[in-house]
């Protein structure tokens, strides 16, 4: 069996929008924080001295309507246009995060059109935004210098003693998404990184260590029976 991704199939565009609307309505009703990456969720809760549950009820910090303006960009078959540019510079870090992910989803041309704005996000106050922008620029680099700068941002955030257990896993995942020929020269540096965040108890502190094992013994980019670029 083979899974067929219908997300970009124009035949199902209206169905996809209907399903997303239902999802957003459910998020509103249940105060679900699914539109926040985990690292950003914990950062915002800590900065404002709120529990995640209270954060979900604070419209100034977590407005699903505002976040939709960024998270829905990836549905635009024309590449988002000015919406991407505006959201990459938006006030809410989650909007900037979703705008960066839209570039990753929409591909090389869209990424290159917004390379300057994405590069500025490598120094964003939010580590979640840094990581998202870095993955985009590492995946669709303008040049080798830009790719290396993006990878260095991911490596810095992959240290949980500098970022957090949550950001470290996000950065390690972004590194793991890179082709093995790109990742191979960095594997020894990754292996030397700490795996524990002294400020995070319990289960989250196991995530980075498991990612280290996966990166050290990866699934190949392509199996022998597959064609590259499939």
List the predicted regions and their residue ranges.
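Short His/Asp/Glu-rich catalytic/ion-coordination signatures at enzyme active sites or charged loops
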Residues: 2-8
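Long, internal low-complexity/basic segments
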Residues: 8-230
């Amino acid at each position: 069996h083979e899974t067929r991704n219908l997300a970009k199939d124009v035949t199902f565009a209206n169905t996809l929008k209907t399903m997303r609307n239902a999802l957003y309505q459910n998020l509103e009703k249940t105060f679900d924080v699914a539109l926040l990456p985990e690292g950003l969720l914990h950062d915002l809760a800590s900065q404002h001295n709120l529990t995640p549950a209270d954060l979900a009820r604070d419209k100034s910090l977590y407005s699903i309507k505002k976040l939709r303006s960024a998270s829905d960009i990836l549905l635009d078959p024309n590449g988002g246009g000015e919406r991407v540019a505006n959201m990459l510079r938006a006030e809410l870090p989650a909007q900037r995060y979703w705008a960066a992910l839209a570039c990753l989803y929409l591909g090389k041309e869209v990424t290159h059109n917004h390379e300057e704005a994405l590069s500025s996000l490598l120094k964003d106050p939010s580590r979640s935004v840094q990581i998202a922008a870095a993955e985009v620029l590492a995946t669709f680099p303008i040049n080798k210098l830009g790719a290396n700068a993006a990878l260095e941002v991911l490596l810095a955030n992959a240290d949980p003693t500098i970022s957090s257990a949550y950001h470290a896993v996000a950065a390690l995942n972004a590194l793991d998404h890179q082709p093995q020929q790109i990742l191979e020269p960095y594997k020894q540096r990754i292996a030397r990184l700490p795996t524990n965040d002294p400020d995070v108890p319990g289960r989250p502190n196991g995530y980075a260590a498991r990612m280290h094992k996966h990166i050290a013994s990866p699934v190949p980019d392509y199996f022998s029976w597959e064609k590259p670029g499939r």
